[in-house]
């Protein structure tokens, strides 16, 4: 990361896409996409997804590392080309507890990430805990971030410190996506970004972390990009120019969250304006969902009724029976809920892919389709971009490859924006 940031600060148009997903097919796609390049791939886990208690994936940081490395070995991607990151590391999961208890868990969280070899650490203590004022004072946020940084430094080996990098600050939306419809978005003011940097510098120095400050590579801000279930707020470069100009006088770049669904031109403009770390998550699993839905429609027409997976019906049944991952985010009317379950841009289906019933139905569908020749006309109907690549000889009409290429479509846009 440090080399990439140095190149950007030296005037090169270079950025990096941060893949924020624990889905094995998404991780496989991210690694396979860059297998034949010289680029490194940044894969990040969030604190609610992966933590010392397992998170919602059931994985600790060490488990996640091995999970990613196993996929890398299968793909033929060198492990040393993978950068592992931890996103929103702090009290996010334990906000209902008092600050002392939440921070104690957060300290252990950060230590486990660093011990497991994660080298990009987002120190985010911006969340109010039980009994805290809302919002927290910037000084409190910075002091807690310094506590977390101290924890990271305390377990890092000398070798790790050479690679270790920190990200500070936070964007406006909560981790995991917007819970309601958005009309506009608040772009971070330069004064607020400067205050974030100033308060963190002061807090780090007070804890004897002056050297660690040199490892702070980025600050998270809101550049004016966001999405909800059916709306996308697109990047307006002119609105972010004050931020772009301010960061030029520092050693850092910006990290932009929720950059999903922007245009490839927007990604290029974001990187030009020093938002050099572009995080993406739901757009990748949304592309995965689109591919699975398309293949499910193809299966409906090609496979005898008694052998079909019933994949789409199974997904719907499970999500309606177990609504905990979408209920507070989606609309309440039955028809509206179904539309959101299937097609929301926030893609909360992503939490359900590991469910045994859904996984088994998708596996059945894949086996069914691997045993037949999919007519080109059907691929043109349901996966038109993939049809074009089959025609040009870039792609085969194999279900797994079709899913991979659908995810590649998202990664292609980021590659354009981050181009070296």
Curated annotation (Swiss-Prot):
GO biological process, one term: D-tagatose 6-phosphate catabolic process
Gene Ontology CC terms: plasma membrane
Entries under InterPro entries matching the protein: Aldolase_TIM, GatZ/KbaZ-like, GatZ_KbaZ_carbometab, TagBP_ald_GatZ
Assigned keywords, A-Z: Galactitol metabolism
Pfam families xrefs: GatZ_KbaZ-like (PF08013)
Pathway annotation: Carbohydrate metabolism; D-tagatose 6-phosphate degradation; D-glyceraldehyde 3-phosphate and glycerone phosphate from D-tagatose 6-phosphate: step 2/2
Summary of the function given for this chain in its UniProt record: Component of the tagatose-1,6-bisphosphate aldolase GatYZ that is required for full activity and stability of the Y subunit. Could have a chaperone-like function for the proper and stable folding of GatY. When expressed alone, GatZ does not show any aldolase activity. Is involved in the catabolism of galactitol.
HAMAP family recorded: Tagatose_aldol_GatZ (MF_01296)
Protein family membership: Belongs to the GatZ/KbaZ family. GatZ subfamily.
Oligomer status and interactors: Forms a complex with GatY.
Protein name per its UniProtKB record: D-tagatose-1,6-bisphosphate aldolase subunit GatZ
Protein source organism: Escherichia coli O9:H4 (strain HS)
Taxonomic lineage of the native organism: Bacteria, Pseudomonadati, Pseudomonadota, Gammaproteobacteria, Enterobacterales
Name of the coding gene: gatZ
